[in-house]
């Protein structure tokens, strides 16, 4: 038998079947670096519309985790897709460098007794080391950006511009000093921002405490009685016994009904609705003697249980009936609501009792409990209450309680003198900050949409922003306070600029080593130099101002400087939040046009990632075993708006999907062997009908893919590309064209038409996958025929796809119908193969018994129907002629009959044809193959 292999156009490409991503990806990174890809993109972007994604800075501490990888990959997909869409899309990565975690690391390594300047020096060194490690990991993910010049909040210029941003807010009169309860961590020794608070279960004692009445006559009158014939107590319930020593008032709701209960040896004042549950808790019998509204009890005095002072009754709307007694004990130093209620009743800052020090220990002068740590003092307070006869009940509950996000230890509210940005303070011009921020939220697009209501609720209900911290490693609040009046220096804004100029040269150390006389001269003795530092959320929250307009100047000239902020859903109370407040305070609008939120990673069972559960996925390990492109494909394939599931099994499924896409791409490249688009590309009107359909299908898909990228629906991009590779290409088009591609003349219209379609599809496909499979797309790009830019990222979406006119005979609807018929035939062929009736498809002859309209449609393909169905023979017959053994199909009006061909198999095309063996010179070939190798070649019109 003659070997006709040399007469076939067999596929050939150097593009490897095995990806070898862990080994090959670093070569691509080197290539991008060698050609200066990021710099070239900036050079060609000058005339393009700008799209700015501003990077939310990760904290410069520790290795990156899977959440970091998700975040950076999503950002890179957006930046790359915007670049391909014709935008100038710079990406400046950044790092958050100041704050307690780094200071804590330095103290752990070098001890807590370091001089402050040495602490700052070591913190700066530590942050720089951490940044280098994280940067290498982010680059390895394939993230394209200005890695040689990232922004760092500890850069001198950034520290200086942060001071300038604060000065802008001082200038507009948003900043003030006040005594207020703030979230306080004993381990941090500092106030915490709202975003630094997390909630966890905690066991706490609960106590019911009776405060003896001091104004017995007034209490009797409030309940409509002439007098009281026995002692009376108003009863509070609390989970914080340690706050009792600081009690200064008792709060009732003005509209709640309160009862005077005869409990035997005393009267008890309780909310009427809670009398029964309270008496059960006290194990007492009791009878309601009289009732009164809460407002009737206002300003009646009761006595503190063990100190010689009074606790008046104040009215407060926040008192509720969901637990306790309906009366709230008020320690204004340790509760925000208590604080504001007491202030409303005229209590001055000097009157507020604050016996708990910054380390959680009572001041030594506090009677009974001085020098005790508050959590350890709880049982001692309970014992004292029992001793004086004021303890009515004592239990333990497990409840959700605020904790420090770093130390995982319980927090308290603690009234301290701090610097605040006022939410409702009237600025020099315009609306309050709260009003500005709420209005800005309505002008911002949220992805997903529910983020708008979430952020709106947080802004509407939040207190003033405490921006001061009592730490060493942070940007200073460079204020001078008059020692006598407590007022800021009248030249504060001007002085802040002088400080900023010094910080620009020397960093934050310039302020801490500054002698006040250098700036204030002879007035220095009258002023106190403030050494508080700024909340780290102020650091990151002002990056839009001092990075996009300052150090890198990539933002828009007016309006929001960034088109998009993209972070995890926790940043509604973090970076999104602080950036909104600073943007509205300084510029009177949000710093962003869109906010995109992604969820957190969980395992395939929906559990949080935890080392103790052993379900963590380390991105570096995935990269080393599967490759960064697999990680990127997994991120793209997931609906990130909710929880993002990841496990080894899930990643393996992504690897399987990747192989399908790679194999499809390899098929395209291998069949473009010998194709030069400069000379071989056919215009649409000269192409075969099936090829024109394939290009049209790619065009329709590209429109959908571009829209999905625009709307950040990357999982739709993935599913559309994957389905195109599996179904339209792998399950239909590519199988059909193999015969024509391999067996027709190398330069025939039939083959060049097919190659033209494959070329167009490959050109489009490589761009579709480039934002997601960044490394693989670059690899594919190098193997595509024709002249092209150095990198796929220097191109834009492919514009060579042509639309199939609606008025052609074999239009989109026609091919949809053919695909359905082919699927029905494939199903019957599978059944026949399973029954051993036929071997391969080409051993089969199929007769299609079709109703008239369908028969007319299929007949348009003529003799080429068999090539579409990939059978040796395909015969059309009327449905009425179907024999009893014809099989019904899923296509209406179509029955099928498959039989094994009795003809010999062609040794070249493998079709079973009756003319095989009828040609003496080529006894192994069919007439079609002989025509293709010796004659002018077969002519195809459709497929």
Curated annotation (Swiss-Prot):
Entry keywords, A to Z: Aminoacyl-tRNA synthetase, ATP-binding, Cytoplasm, Ligase, Metal-binding, Nucleotide-binding, Protein biosynthesis, Zinc
Motif 'HIGH' region boundaries: 58-68
Entry annotated with the keyword ATP-binding: yes
Free-text comment on the cofactor: Binds 1 zinc ion per subunit.
Top EC class of this enzyme: ligase
Residue numbers binding L-isoleucyl-5'-AMP: 567
Cofactor field: Zn(2+)
Entries under InterPro entries matching the protein: aa-tRNA-synth_I_CS, aa-tRNA-synth_Ia, Anticodon_Ile_BEm, Ile-tRNA-ligase, Ile-tRNA-ligase_type1, Ile-tRNA_ligase, M/V/L/I-tRNA-synth_anticd-bd, Rossmann-like_a/b/a_fold
EC number: 6.1.1.5
A Pfam family reported for this protein in Swiss-Prot or TrEMBL: zf-FPG_IleRS
UniProt note: domains: IleRS has two distinct active sites: one for aminoacylation and one for editing. The misactivated valine is translocated from the active site to the editing site, which sterically excludes the correctly activated isoleucine. The single editing site contains two valyl binding pockets, one specific for each substrate (Val-AMP or Val-tRNA(Ile)).
Function: Catalyzes the attachment of isoleucine to tRNA(Ile). As IleRS can inadvertently accommodate and process structurally similar amino acids such as valine, to avoid such errors it has two additional distinct tRNA(Ile)-dependent editing activities. One activity is designated as 'pretransfer' editing and involves the hydrolysis of activated Val-AMP. The other activity is designated 'posttransfer' editing and involves deacylation of mischarged Val-tRNA(Ile).
Protein name as it appears in the record: Isoleucine--tRNA ligase
Organism of this sequence: Pseudomonas aeruginosa (strain LESB58)
UniProt lineage: Bacteria, Pseudomonadati, Pseudomonadota, Gammaproteobacteria, Pseudomonadales
């Amino acid at each position: 038998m003659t070997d006709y292999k040399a007469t076939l156009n067999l596929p050939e490409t150097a593009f490897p079947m095995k990806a070898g991503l862990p080994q090959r990806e670093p070569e691509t990174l080197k290539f991008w670096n060698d050609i200066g890809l990021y710099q070239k993109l900036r050079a060609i972007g000058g005339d393009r519309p700008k799209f700015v994604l501003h990077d939310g800075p990760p904290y410069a501490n520790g290795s990156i985790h899977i959440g970091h990888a998700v975040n950076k990959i999503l950002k890179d997909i957006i930046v790359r897709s915007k670049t391909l869409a014709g935008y100038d899309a710079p990406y400046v990565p950044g790092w958050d460098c100041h704050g307690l975690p780094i200071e804590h690391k330095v103290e752990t390594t070098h001890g807590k007794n370091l001089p402050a300047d040495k602490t700052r020096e070591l913190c700066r060194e530590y942050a720089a080391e951490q940044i280098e490690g994280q940067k290498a990991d982010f680059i390895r993910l394939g993230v394209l950006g200005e890695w040689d010049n990232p922004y760092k909040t500890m850069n001198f210029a950034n520290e200086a511009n942060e001071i300038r941003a604060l000065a802008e807010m001082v200038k507009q009169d948003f900043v003030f000093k006040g005594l207020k309860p703030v979230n306080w961590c004993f381990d941090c020794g500092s106030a915490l921002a709202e975003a630094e608070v997390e909630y966890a279960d905690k066991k706490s004692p609960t106590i019911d405490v009776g405060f003896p009445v001091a104004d017995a006559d007034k209490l009797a009158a409030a309940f409509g009685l002439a007098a009281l014939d026995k002692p009376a107590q108003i009863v509070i319930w609390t989970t914080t016994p340690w706050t009792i020593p600081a009690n200064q008032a008792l709060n009732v709701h003005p509209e709640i009904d309160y009862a005077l209960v005869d409990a035997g040896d005393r009267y008890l004042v309780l909310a009427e609705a809670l009398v029964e549950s309270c008496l059960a808790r006290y194990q007492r019998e009791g009878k309601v003697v009289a009732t009164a509204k809460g407002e009737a009890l206002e300003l009646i005095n009761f006595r503190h249980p063990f100190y010689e002072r009074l606790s008046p009754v104040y009215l407060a709307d926040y008192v509720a009936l969901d637990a306790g007694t309906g009366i709230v004990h008020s320690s204004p130093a340790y509760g925000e609501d208590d604080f504001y209620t007491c202030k409303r009743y005229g209590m001055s800052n000097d009157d507020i009792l604050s016996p708990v020090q910054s380390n959680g220990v009572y001041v030594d002068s506090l009677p009974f409990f001085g020098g005790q740590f508050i959590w350890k003092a709880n049982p001692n307070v309970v014992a004292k209450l029992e001793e004086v006869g004021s303890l009515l009940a004592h239990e333990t509950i497990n409840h959700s309680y605020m904790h420090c996000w770093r130390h995982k230890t319980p927090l308290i509210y603690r009234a301290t003198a701090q610097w605040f940005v006022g939410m409702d303070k009237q600025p020099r011009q315009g609306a309050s900050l709260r009003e500005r921020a709420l209005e800005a939220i309505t002008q911002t697009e949220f992805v997903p949409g529910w983020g708008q209501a979430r952020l709106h609720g947080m802004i509407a209900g939040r207190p003033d922003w405490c921006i001061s911290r009592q730490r060493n490693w942070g940007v200073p609040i460079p204020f001078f306070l008059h020692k006598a009046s407590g007022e800021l220096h009248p030249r504060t804004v001007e002085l802040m600029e002088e400080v900023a100029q010094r910080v620009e040269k020397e960093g934050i150390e310039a302020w801490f080593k500054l002698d006040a006389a250098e700036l204030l001269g002879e007035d220095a003795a009258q002023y106190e130099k403030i050494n508080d530092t700024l909340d780290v959320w102020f650091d990151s929250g002002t990056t839009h101002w001092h990075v996009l307009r300052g150090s890198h100047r990539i933002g828009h000239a007016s309006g929001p400087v960034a088109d998009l902020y993209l972070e995890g859903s926790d940043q509604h109370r973090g970076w999104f939040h602080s950036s909104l407040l600073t943007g509205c305070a300084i510029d009177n609008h949000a710093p962003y046009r869109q906010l995109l939120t992604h969820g957190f990673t969980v395992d395939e069972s929906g559990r949080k990632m935890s080392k103790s559960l052993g379900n963590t996925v380390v991105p570096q390990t995935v990269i080393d075993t599967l490759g960064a492109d697999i990680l990127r494909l997994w991120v793209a394939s997931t609906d990130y708006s909710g929880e993002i599931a990841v496990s080894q099994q899930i990643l393996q499924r992504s690897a399987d999907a990747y192989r399908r896409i790679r194999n499809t791409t390899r098929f395209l490249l291998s069949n473009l062997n010998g194709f030069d688009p400069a000379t071989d590309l056919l215009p649409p009107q000269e192409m075969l009908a099936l090829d024109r359909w394939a290009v049209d299908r790619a065009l329709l898909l590209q429109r959908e893919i571009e829209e999905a990228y625009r709307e950040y629906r990357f999982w739709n991009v993935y599913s559309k590309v994957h389905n195109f590779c599996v179904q339209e290409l792998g399950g239909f088009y590519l199988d059909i064209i193999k015969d024509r591609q391999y067996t027709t003349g190398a330069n025939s219209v039939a083959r060049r038409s097919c190659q033209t379609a494959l070329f167009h599809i490959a050109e489009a496909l490589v761009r579709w996958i480039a934002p997601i499979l960044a490394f693989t797309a670059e690899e594919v790009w190098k193997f595509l025929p024709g002249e092209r830019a150095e990198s796929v990222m220097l191109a834009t979406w492919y514009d060579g796809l042509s639309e199939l006119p609606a008025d052609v005979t074999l239009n989109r609807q026609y091919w949809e119908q053919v695909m359905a018929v082919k699927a029905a035939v494939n199903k019957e062929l599978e059944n026949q193969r399973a029954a051993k009736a036929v071997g391969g498809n080409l051993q089969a002859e199929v007769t299609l018994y079709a109703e008239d309209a369908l028969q007319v449609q299929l007949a348009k393909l003529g003799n080429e129907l068999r090539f579409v169905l990939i059978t040796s023979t395909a015969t059309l017959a009327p449905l009425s002629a179907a024999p009893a053994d014809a099989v019904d199909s899923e296509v209406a009006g179509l029955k099928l009959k498959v039989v094994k061909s009795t003809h010999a198999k062609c040794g070249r095309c493998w079709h079973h044809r009756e003319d095989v063996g009828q040609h003496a010179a080529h006894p192994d070939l069919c007439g079609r193959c002989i025509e293709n190798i010796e004659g002018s070649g077969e002519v195809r019109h459709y497929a």
